Amino acid sequence: MKFEGLFLVFNSVSGNHKIIGISYLWLAYWFGMIGFYMSVLIRTELSMSGLKIITMDTLEIYNLLFTLHGLIMVFFNIMTGLFGGIGNYLYPVLLGYCDVVYPRVNLYSLLFQPIGFVLVVSSIYLEIGSGTGWTLYPPLSTSLSNVGIDFIIFGLLAAGIASTLSSVNFITTFTSVKTIGFVIDRISPAAWSIVLTSFLLLLSLPVVTAVFLMVFLDRHYNTMFFESSNSGDPVLYQHLFWFFGHPEVYIMILPGFGIISLLLSTYTTKEMFGNQTMILAMGFNSFVRLFGLGTSYVHIRFGSRYSRYFTTVTILIALPTGNKIFNWVTTLQCVESIKSLGLVLFTVLFIVNFVIGGTTGVVLGNAGIDLALHDTVYVVGHFHFVLSIGAIISMICFIIYIQRMLLFGIILSNRLSSLIAPIFMISVLLTFLPMHFTGFSPLPRRIPDYPDEMWGWNFICTLGATMMLVLKLAILFIISL
């Protein structure tokens, strides 16, 4: 096997933005593989009714698996790959710069990522782990005495420092654009996506950093911020966390919008339809996301007035999203020639997944329906369609775009990528589409057992996850030849 990717990681001390970007992608790949293997273990347990791998004495392991799966995939796979990898590699090029303004700060932000990852993963080996869920809701996170939760908190703080440094660097680079003949309104949607993501991170990260520190103080210094028996309020945690968490969904997928727009205009030999409206739609979505936080925890029953408000905000988010879908589909419809069929197939797969996830998101945006479906696997299917799979597809497209499949230096042929795309699509549909049907049953999430009559749908989901695993291993085999 070639070790070019590992060589690039060690040579990232050069401060070159492309090498740092590839190093980010390399880290994101291996972080993502660890998180994906955890999800395969979860699906293996759910393949049949009854407790098979997990026993009554080891139920905490199941809680630990889905907690770390969520944390790793959100903060160390998607954020590292899309914002760190694509942002560092592509952003200065799109602005006409040879590098970002502060290359050394860029390097420091890279070094914080593996530190945070090691802290989070090491929580597995500390006492009984930390099966709190990726949201770390109190009173569960404040009442458990094991030190694993503290390691998770500091690991997430390290990842937050990395994202903050990158955001400041990208915004400073954007405000320093002085290329001759370069007008702000002519900046590509891919560059704007990085800028908007940076602004969202700078607005939301201080809040979630504060709330994690408050949890730490509650655990060790009895500050009682979230302890209801001592004038604290656990709902306050949800308000503060989802001020970050709701924009975070858009933070993770926004660079994906930019790279899909860039690839469509590059490989279809067609200028992006509605380029300016695409930028305006991303900007409007970024702004509205900050005010729709209650959609993610409307089940605590705000009251009819606030429920109507958050339902309205969710519908407003869907409108510019529909505009982006229209622009992409129109660009594809008007193509005269295609340079890379494989890349175009992956972009079509991205659009299909996002349409499915967006449609189910409008359903969950209705407060009355969300009350019934919030704690079911319907939410799991929606979340993976609208965000996780789209983000992974964006990274795959970008890796093919820079002609370094999985950073080992292999050039993925058009025929091979055209074969991988439909297989990936089938595995995604098999894994997550049945969750919408079982969610209406309703099948609760975060539970390792279920009634026998739901065995068929869960087996199909496990089959799709197994197909994804085989596909990833096949790609590793190809690049090792």
From Swiss-Prot:
Gene3D superfamilies, alphabetized: Cytochrome c oxidase-like, subunit I domain
Keyword Nucleotidyltransferase in annotation: no
Broad class of the protein's primary localization: mitochondrion
Residues that span the membrane, as ranges: 22-42, 64-84, 109-129, 151-171, 194-214, 240-260, 278-298, 309-329, 343-363, 382-402, 420-440, 459-479
UniProt enzyme class: translocase
Binding-site residues, Fe(II)-heme a: 69, 384
Binding site for Ca(2+): 45, 50, 448
An annotated Gene Ontology molecular function: heme binding
Keyword annotations: Calcium, Copper, Electron transport, Heme, Iron, Magnesium, Membrane, Metal-binding, Mitochondrion, Mitochondrion inner membrane, Respiratory chain, Translocase, Transmembrane, Transmembrane helix, Transport
Binding residues annotated for Cu cation, in chain numbering: 246
Function in brief: Component of the cytochrome c oxidase, the last enzyme in the mitochondrial electron transport chain which drives oxidative phosphorylation. The respiratory chain contains 3 multisubunit complexes succinate dehydrogenase (complex II, CII), ubiquinol-cytochrome c oxidoreductase (cytochrome b-c1 complex, complex III, CIII) and cytochrome c oxidase (complex IV, CIV), that cooperate to transfer electrons derived from NADH and succinate to molecular oxygen, creating an electrochemical gradient over the inner membrane that drives transmembrane transport and the ATP synthase.
Subunit structure comment from the entry: Component of the cytochrome c oxidase (complex IV, CIV), a multisubunit enzyme composed of a catalytic core of 3 subunits and several supernumerary subunits. The complex exists as a monomer or a dimer and forms supercomplexes (SCs) in the inner mitochondrial membrane with ubiquinol-cytochrome c oxidoreductase (cytochrome b-c1 complex, complex III, CIII).
Family named by the database record: Belongs to the heme-copper respiratory oxidase family.
Name used for this protein in its record: Cytochrome c oxidase subunit 1
Lineage, opening ranks: Eukaryota, Sar, Alveolata, Apicomplexa, Aconoidasida
